[in-house]
Design a protein with these regions (language model features):
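Patatin-like phospholipase
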Residues: 1-44, 52-240
Length: 240
């Protein structure tokens, strides 16, 4: 599959809320002629699900129909099994995900070119203390958000880079502002080696109000609301 070097995407974490918000934004952009399918995408945690779904043309409705594992859940492979229900054993070279390798806690990028996306999203979303690490090729990985919520600095080069940061902006007061500052710093690092511009999305106040507490990030009904909010934000956003 050929990628589109003029456009790329990087999507951050945020639980079920983050998946809904990111896929809403992605769908809203697609309606406006900015289609990320077939473009290089980098996802962290929830963002890895958004990237995989976009690459494989899996709808948010299909993802929302998955049963959410109970937390904490020490069983190995439980999240990968859920992901395989919608992604099967498909691979896709346009998808890369950020994971944290244990025990060294090293931020690592894995490619979907030769590893099933179901395994990649499970590794990138294995929240320590809630889910068991995901093993890939003999190595153990946990949630990529342990080291960075978005990892813009690790994104591929593109003329325009779509950044979706579900936990930045108005989310959780000071925490959202911290994520935003971290993401801004990563953008500066990315710009040192790439000349592209950014199209940035972070939840507005109304969207952030859907998830006022951390546990709300894993509520399916709130995630559906976030999807429609992301859709509206992308439709209304001024894009040059």
């Amino acid at each position: 599959m050929e990628t589109n070097p003029t456009l790329g995407g990087v999507f951050g974490g945020g639980g079920l809320f983050g998946i809904g918000y990111a896929l809403g934004v992605i769908e809203g952009l697609r309606e406006r002629g900015i289609d990320l399918h077939g473009c290089p995408m980098l996802g962290t945690s929830a963002g890895s699900w958004a990237a995989a779904a976009t690459a494989l043309k899996v709808s948010y409705k299909d993802l929302a129909g998955l049963e959410v594992p109970t937390f904490p859940n020490p069983r190995a492979g439980v999240l990968a099994a859920s992901a395989r229900e919608v992604f099967g054993n498909a691979t896709d070279p346009t998808v890369r995900v950020v994971v944290t390798e244990v025990p060294r806690l090293r931020r690592t990028v894995l490619s979907g070119a030769d590893t099933p996306l179901a395994d990649l999203v499970a590794a990138s979303s294995a929240v320590p203390g809630l889910l068991a690490p995901q093993r890939i090729n003999g190595r153990r990985y946990v949630d990529g958000g342990v080291r960075s919520g978005v990892s813009v600095d690790l994104a591929d080069g593109a003329e325009r880079l779509v950044i979706i940061a579900p936990l930045a902006g108005a989310m959780f007061g000071p925490f959202g502002r911290f994520v935003e500052r971290r993401t801004d710093a990563e953008q500066r690092i990315w710009s040192e080696t790439h000349s592209g511009t950014f199209i940035e999305f972070a939840p507005r106040a109304v969207t952030a109000g859907i998830a006022s507490r951390p546990q709300h990030l894993f509520d399916k009904a709130r995630a559906l609301e976030a999807y429609f909010c992301g859709l509206d934000e992308a439709r209304q956003r001024t894009i040059e």
